[in-house]
């Protein structure tokens, strides 16, 4: 390579970088990335303390990365390039057959998975109300055959055996989902189960409580969206897959929803359709995360009051359970601080079910409040 040509390439590269810098300076800062589903770093304030402790330069680096021109397109191009050279794991998410993204489950390292089982056991000791434990295996276990050859993911079935050692009645979500593993029971671009998966999960719960199962032919699914790109889509950088279809199965007629989002009861909604025009479409189920929510059904088939101590999987599960129970109470320990045993006693609860996806259960530090 001649010196003249080398200088030419250097000049072109410098012009390219300079152009990007000018472009970035001229562009208005974005507050969030809908593709990545997260808030972006804003321009940091220059202060003496931030310079001295080094945080200013760290914030500047994060700011430049987040506000880089065409960031969403670059991250997608990076993932596509890595796929072409044989990579199958993107930000701890596997690209699997059938345009499916599956989150790898890492082995717990801090003992929280054992501690959380202990907190559940302590709650059972504090309450005289019948209590059940339901841990939902993720797609990495149920769809293990879809993972790339040699792909690793923590053994969730072994953990279910460990959980059974508590002696509590177990809701066998694993058997219910595995029996229908050839069906779309999980979203391809999100970690949650679909309405179909939640339907099978509801019947697993009703079975262990000795209640009649729901009939699939009793529901007429409504296609709520054909453009759902979930959290795995956002986190992986794999932005070329066909979007998921989201369905609503349960009719809203006859159901009354009450939410406690700010500490006081307010009218809720079974399906908040405003989210269907946004990135986080799964939040349309019950309106997303909230400390406490109660679904009432005067025409429930069997009656009774059920308390779900739960994560977001129950947002899609609860509408089905409301077909059997007169009241379904959903308590999220991340946001609600009344001791669950006290809440159950004060509200005339007939049965308590701790329902979590396994990846959430083994990492949630808020389950300590179950032992209060």
Feature annotation, model-predicted:
Residues 1-372:
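Extracellular glycan-modifying ectodomains
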